């Protein structure tokens, strides 16, 4: 299995690669990816969960029991639950977001997909996301999976990042460009 050296070079990448290889051996890559999506959503919604994963003052044991409880509530697979326990034992839960991103990248690469991070000022409607996905798929020549987020600071427009390519059509950038041009 050919996994990018760039991903493996990071701590998060090494953990994500190990999880991917275990999931592939057990034939549960899709289930683990679904688990990580649930976990990512929970991290985004719960300040308490973020605090548990990022607070170094919480003991390993308390982190492990809290994360085990979260895994139970979310209905995560045994492999994902064990992985989270390992992260807690090794004090690596603070890197969970990076590990989720790295796992998604590895899984998408294995499927021949690319992930496009789409940042917009307001939540995009389903038809807008589908239209964007169609256009990006045509442009990239392979299946594009969208990962939408909202950043009100953009004011309007979109910023799309696919790998190292960035398409910035945000109003914020246009205003900054105009301001710099006016400064002379």
Curated annotation (Swiss-Prot):
Protein topology in the membrane: Peripheral membrane protein
Originating species: Erythrobacter litoralis (strain HTCC2594)
Gene3D superfamilies: N-terminal domain of the delta subunit of the F1F0-ATP synthase
Protein family (similarity comment): Belongs to the ATPase delta chain family.
Keywords: ATP synthesis, Cell inner membrane, Cell membrane, CF(1), Hydrogen ion transport, Ion transport, Membrane, Transport
Location of the protein in the cell: Cell inner membrane
Name of the featured protein: ATP synthase subunit delta
Entries under HAMAP family matching the protein: ATP_synth_delta_bact (MF_01416)
Pfam families registered for this protein in UniProt: OSCP
Location, primary (coarse class): membrane
PANTHER family: ATP SYNTHASE DELTA CHAIN (PTHR11910)
Keyword Cell inner membrane: yes
Gene expressing this chain: atpH
Function recorded in the entry: F(1)F(0) ATP synthase produces ATP from ADP in the presence of a proton or sodium gradient. F-type ATPases consist of two structural domains, F(1) containing the extramembraneous catalytic core and F(0) containing the membrane proton channel, linked together by a central stalk and a peripheral stalk. During catalysis, ATP synthesis in the catalytic domain of F(1) is coupled via a rotary mechanism of the central stalk subunits to proton translocation.
Domain of life: Bacteria
GO molecular function: proton-transporting ATP synthase activity, rotational mechanism
A GO cellular-component term linked to this record: proton-transporting ATP synthase complex
Quaternary structure, from the entry: F-type ATPases have 2 components, F(1) - the catalytic core - and F(0) - the membrane proton channel. F(1) has five subunits: alpha(3), beta(3), gamma(1), delta(1), epsilon(1). CF(0) has four main subunits: a(1), b(1), b'(1) and c(10-14). The alpha and beta chains form an alternating ring which encloses part of the gamma chain. F(1) is attached to F(0) by a central stalk formed by the gamma and epsilon chains, while a peripheral stalk is formed by the delta, b and b' chains.
């Amino acid at each position: 299995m050919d996994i990018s050296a760039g991903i493996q070079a990071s701590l998060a990448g090494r953990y994500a690669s190990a999880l991917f290889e275990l999931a592939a051996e057990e034939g549960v890559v899709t289930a683990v990816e679904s688990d990580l999506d649930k976990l990512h959503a929970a991290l985004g919604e719960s300040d308490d969960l973020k605090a548990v994963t990022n607070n170094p003052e919480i003991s390993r044991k308390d982190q492990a029991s809290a994360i085990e409880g979260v895994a139970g509530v979310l209905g995560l697979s045994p492999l994902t639950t064990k992985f989270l326990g390992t992260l807690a034992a090794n004090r690596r839960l603070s890197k969970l977001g990076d590990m989720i991103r790295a796992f998604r990248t590895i899984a998408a690469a294995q499927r021949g997909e690319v992930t496009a991070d789409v940042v917009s000022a307001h939540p995009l409607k389903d038809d807008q996301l589908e239209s964007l996905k169609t256009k990006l798929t045509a442009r990239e020549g392979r299946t594009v999976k969208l990962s939408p987020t909202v950043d009100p600071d953009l004011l309007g427009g979109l910023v799309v990042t696919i790998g190292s390519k960035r398409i910035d059509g945000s109003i914020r950038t246009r205003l900054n460009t105009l301001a710099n041009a006016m400064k002379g």
